[in-house]
Amino acid sequence: MLEADLVSKMLRAVLQSHKNGIALPRLQGEYRSLTGDWIPFKQLGYPTLEAYLRSVPAVVRIETSRSGEITCYAMACTETARIAQLVARQRSSKRKTGRQVNCQMRVKKTMPFFLEGKPKATLRQPGISSDFSINKKPNPTLLRDRGNSLGVKSDAEMPPYTLHTTIGSQVFKDVPVQRHVTMSTNNRFSPKASLPPPFQMHLSRTCAKEMSDNLNQTVEKPNVTPPASYTYKMDEVQNRIKEILNKHNNGIWISKLPHFYKELYKEELNQGILQQFEHWPHICTVEKPCSGGQDLLLYPAKRKQLLRSELDGEKVPPSPLPAPKQLPPLKGCPAAMPGDFKEKVAELLAKYSSGLWASALPKAFEDMYKVKFPEDALKNLASLSDVCTIDYISGNPQKAILYAKLPLPADKILKDAGQAHGDYDIKSMIEQEYLQIEENISKSADTFVENTTVPPLIIPTEASPSVLVVELSNTNEVVIRYVGKDYSAAQELMEDEMKEYYSKNPKVMPVQTVHIGQLLAVNAEEDAWLRAQIISTEENKIKASTVCYVDYGFSENIEKSKAYKLNPKFCSLSFQATKCKLAGLEVLSDDPDLVKVVESLTCGKIFAVEILEKADIPLVVLYDTSGEDDVNINATCLKAICDKSLEAHLQIDAMYTNVRVTNICSDGTLYCQVPCKGLNKLNDLLHKIEDYFHCKHMTSEYFVSLPFCGKVCLFHCKGKWLRVEITNVHSSRALDVQFLDSGTVTSVKVSELREIPPRFLQEIIVIPPQAIKCCLADLPQSIGMWTPDAVLWLRDSVLNCSDCSIKVTKVDETRGIAHIYLFTPKNFPDPHRSINRQITNADLWKHQKDVFLSAISSAASSPNSKSGGTPIPGNSGENFRKSITDAIKKSVVDHSSSFSMQELPPPVHLSKPGEHMDVYVPVACHPGYFVIQPWQEIHKLEVLMEEMILYYSVSEERHVAVEKDQVYAAKVENKWHRVLLKGILTNGLVSVYELDYGKHELVNIRKVQPLADVFRKLPFQAVTAQLAGVKCNQWSEEASMVFRNHVEKKPLVALVQTVIENANPWDRKVVVYLVDTSLPDTDIWIHDFMSEYLVELSKVN
């Protein structure tokens, strides 16, 4: 029993360190890494680990995802709640490791588009890399006894396919190439191939002959520079490899390197990199052992010898780049635009981070600068290409989006200049400077550089990185730390090295004198070594308010005896503590109440962050992802400081008149406006804003250029301006908003929103929402959707009626809802003629299977009686039924003539067998079944999805007699999709198949609407596919997950083998080879990878 208690406590400790849970297969490993032992579930009497976990629900919460993956989460415990809180809030030197946190905004992961950005060019075809660097596919070593490299049948020859080559905007002729399915990319090129002259020139550069032992033929491998887009990633990999080699001074086998790399950085090392080490003398030294084996030894680079040879020669400064020649303008080319005009266009576009339609540029330009827009500018968009990026939609010059050009980083400018002058010169110069620094360091281990420059902190590129909030003085300067392998994990590694260096180096002594700005290594509590910076000093101590731990963002009093000079080698990592600005709170950034609320909600806690603007102090939105739903911290803080005196405080048993019902939801929930001080002040402000906009010319500064969830702005509806809060951003054009003062939710265009004028902003955002959420008392709650007829009758009876009355029976503070009796003007204050009683006494409800409303029970009390209700006059039920019938006849119109169920779009275009096709994989079950979309058509689907959201959000809900195997529009997760109805369930749900994304979903039948003809033009984008080149009768769950991880939600190149046509576009099928060409130096053929995996799996089994 004691052992069981110990195991459960240790298990809880393991799970609590993983905020987003631990997958069941990883749980044993995580447990052992903490305790040194496995979970002894068999000794505890359970046949499996899962059975044991399910037996301790007080410790573990188990969830199963759609894919069947089981994840374990820690359950809350009163014993450890206080400890968890203290750990989260601590600001001591204790480190928080990156792998303890993995915050991701779930709401952001469900976006059906914008996963990879809008495709602006074709994907690199296998065999030809970006910038024409030749790809090198690793030669696998499995199954050589079967005559090929990857277990694919030797006679599986592919028909000739077309290879498209492109340089700049010039497209060369198609080059036919015959290849074997397992051929390495090195073997795809031959000097005899009929390539265009520019391409032949490129291939004829210095080539190194290389024998392919796989196909026994000579290939040519040009030595070319990797593209600029790959430089950053390669530099990161090289630095990591140097770190590994520095820890293994006696050498390391090259075959063992991937294992060490993955163990240290939790990331796979690309196999193609292993073949490039001999070309990286500045990173490592490669040695082939005398034993003659295939494995190689790697050593740290021999830099000192190279240094001497460099320093012996005279240092010649590089000559300046030649000035570009002034060429006369070519005949027929349009004249260049004036410089000041281009500057103004660039300044204007900078305000539109999501781009601006070219057709909207003249008006925005004239609104902003009050000068006439040049007439010929739109006809000559190419002349603006030096100040903006032009994205032509579908190649149509009349439809283009203009984006502001971001300034190039310094290293990119240097790289471009170096390439113009010569790659060799710039490489020599950088190597010389780097080696000079190393030589200076090597001369004396005690030499410290006082003015060492620490590189700036790079903002993470991932969609929603995790941050730890440290402290804040105002919401425009919130101190945070990024959590992740390149941030907190790298910092951990550095601090371990600092501890080893300062603890074991007797020559290192404490500083004798200190000065402002000096960087120090501080021996903090618990024997941790941290970096700190001095701003001011006082006698023998360093003033607390001016000594900051640069990686943690807080200050501390320390003795000089604990301060040491910081070795320059610990200055390569950026300071980890940085600042951010909370979006939407700028106008109240210094408000003491707001600062107090933000501090109480955020300090010491980890959040997912959405970065809106990348700047020195980035603009962000924080999300708490610890609960079932993601909580917008910015919006929560803004609501918390609303003026409570302007709220409508409802009192139990009180009667309120002149109440206006503003919204009725499909579950019977109502939103009401009750006369109060806040409503009067809001109406006055909105009238002033109306007058302000009427008198002032509407310029571009009032257009919303940066929408984000939680932002409060204005929307013009029914002749007046209303407050709305953005609740969901679908795309750069469409988003969902909620009217704060009516409770209505709808989808609108971004261009229809306006910023609140600055003079009214502070006043209007502190007024609480004036829509009060209510429900009808004595009616069953939590029954789901009401019947359409009842909702229609209720809306027709009370919606937007300004003189209704209510009596409050209960206020549920936790749910934020009031239980009321609702009266129309004619029936007030008769309790037996309330809306509540009329609904519960109607026979119409009894004919609905999905609604369970019955006559009011004898125990239910009326507003004026405690012993039950008096019978309603006999004709009231008949009158109600008659009013329902009239409302339905008036509200429901037969739209069947507007929608033809027979009209279907043409089938989506697929490449012919043997040709390439750029595809995107939205869904992957296993190699035998996955779904592809044409990559080049995704932007068209994106536009269609936006239009559907806007169309159906304002369309009247129609009652559809659905039929199986027919095409409809259905709302799935706040978005409208084109679907095929697969089945009708008895519980009010229907099974649908998304025709553009290939997913099967269950939706409420009320969310199914006719598909308008305007949305039947674009071909259905989802095509069922099967992977060629590999066969397996039954794919295991493990193999399926491996396949999904490599292809799902990724753009790939497909080589079409077979197209199986069908009369129904959703029944078409294609058999393809898939190639991942995202890396410039490697083609990953998915069927080869899966073949290797099956072989390895068979060996294990």
From Swiss-Prot:
Q: Which GO terms describe its molecular function?
A: mRNA binding
Query: Taxonomically, which superkingdom?
Result: Eukaryota
Q: Which CDD domains match?
A: LOTUS_1_TDRD7, LOTUS_2_TDRD7, LOTUS_3_TDRD7, Tudor_TDRD7_rpt1, Tudor_TDRD7_rpt2, Tudor_TDRD7_rpt3
Task: Name residues in a coiled coil.
Answer: none
Residue span of region Disordered: 126-147, 859-880
* Known function: Component of specific cytoplasmic RNA granules involved in post-transcriptional regulation of specific genes: probably acts by binding to specific mRNAs and regulating their translation. Required for lens transparency during lens development, by regulating translation of genes such as CRYBB3 and HSPB1 in the developing lens. Also required during spermatogenesis.
Q: What is the protein's given name?
A: Tudor domain-containing protein 7
The species this protein belongs to is Ailuropoda melanoleuca
